[in-house]
Amino acid sequence: VIGSVLGDSSQRAIQCRIAALLAGIPDTVPLHTVNRQCSSGLQAIASVAAAIKAGYYSIGLAGGVESMSTNPMAWEGGINPRVADCDAAQSCLIPMGRC
């Protein structure tokens, strides 16, 4: 579970999947994002902890991908150059519905 707030909804999912792929996490591992404005990373951690406590997960990974304190509200940054070295991460950049 990854907390993210700055990108639009589809961009959040894409950036989190790319981060997982670049970290070596297989694409068979489920991933989802949460958006809780300035506490998205903390919400991700709380969600995983609650799911483990409830028995839904035996293990989980959670975190956040931005710092609201250090990013302007209209951030238009570039894509991590390492994406070019990972075919699976590159495929996340294709807009939905296009081949």
PLM segments and residue spans:
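Short glycine-rich phosphate-binding loop at a beta-alpha junction
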Residues: 1-3
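Short beta-strand-loop/turn "lid" adjacent to the catalytic site in phosphate-handling enzymes
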Residues: 6
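Acyl-thioester C-C bond-transforming condensing/cleaving domain
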Residues: 9-13, 20-21, 25-99
